[in-house]
Amino acid sequence: MSRRCTEVKRKSLPSNKYQSISAATPNQIMLASKLINKLTHHGNKELVEKMLDKIIQHIKHKYKADGFEVLESACNNVKPSLQVESLRIGGATYQVPSPVNELRSYTLAIKWIINSAANRTFEKSMWQKIAEELYEASNGRGGAVKKKDDNHKMAEANQAFSHLITKRRSRGN
């Protein structure tokens, strides 16, 4: 047993800019703030907020859809329900599937959307890449959805080892 204190989970406060939008639900505001925090480099949050404004306007003008709804549906289509953990037992390493916490699933979804947007080559700027990736993910296409499907296939392929994670957790390790 570890003698260290449990880490207190810090909540990231949503931007005041998006809280004032009455059309956005609290879940959409939470996803927007997660996206902003994941994209922020060197504390330059205002730059990323302007970039998110461009993303939402681009989706609104090009696809005639609400940007926050596209963000929410994209994250719901990309978020995983299972993840694969490496577990070393008796000199062998097993890939063991385990369920994903909902907050972690949204974090993984946003991370996968950003990574697959960064790998896109057709658009010039990052905000265009993210806007296109969000729209494709909301329609069930794109690199982030493929990453989720690959993750689920890996979990299904290693379903035989799922009993190991429950034994491991019940022992307290």
Curated annotation (Swiss-Prot):
<dbReference type="InterPro" id="IPR000235">
    <property type="entry name" value="Ribosomal_uS7"/>
</dbReference>
<dbReference type="GO" id="GO:0019843">
    <property type="term" value="F:rRNA binding"/>
</dbReference>
<protein>
    <recommendedName>
        <fullName>Small ribosomal subunit protein uS7</fullName>
    </recommendedName>
</protein>
<keyword id="KW-0820">tRNA-binding</keyword>
<keyword id="KW-0687">Ribonucleoprotein</keyword>
<dbReference type="GO" id="GO:0000049">
    <property type="term" value="F:tRNA binding"/>
</dbReference>
<dbReference type="Pfam" id="PF00177">
    <property type="entry name" value="Ribosomal_S7"/>
</dbReference>
<comment type="similarity">
    <text>Belongs to the universal ribosomal protein uS7 family.</text>
</comment>
<dbReference type="GO" id="GO:0015935">
    <property type="term" value="C:small ribosomal subunit"/>
</dbReference>
<dbReference type="GO" id="GO:0003735">
    <property type="term" value="F:structural constituent of ribosome"/>
</dbReference>
<dbReference type="InterPro" id="IPR005717">
    <property type="entry name" value="Ribosomal_uS7_bac/org-type"/>
</dbReference>
<dbReference type="InterPro" id="IPR036823">
    <property type="entry name" value="Ribosomal_uS7_dom_sf"/>
</dbReference>
<keyword id="KW-0699">rRNA-binding</keyword>
<keyword id="KW-0694">RNA-binding</keyword>
<comment type="subunit">
    <text>Part of the 30S ribosomal subunit. Contacts proteins S9 and S11.</text>
</comment>
<keyword id="KW-0689">Ribosomal protein</keyword>
<dbReference type="GO" id="GO:0006412">
    <property type="term" value="P:translation"/>
</dbReference>
<dbReference type="InterPro" id="IPR023798">
    <property type="entry name" value="Ribosomal_uS7_dom"/>
</dbReference>
<comment type="function">
    <text>One of the primary rRNA binding proteins, it binds directly to 16S rRNA where it nucleates assembly of the head domain of the 30S subunit. Is located at the subunit interface close to the decoding center, probably blocks exit of the E-site tRNA.</text>
</comment>
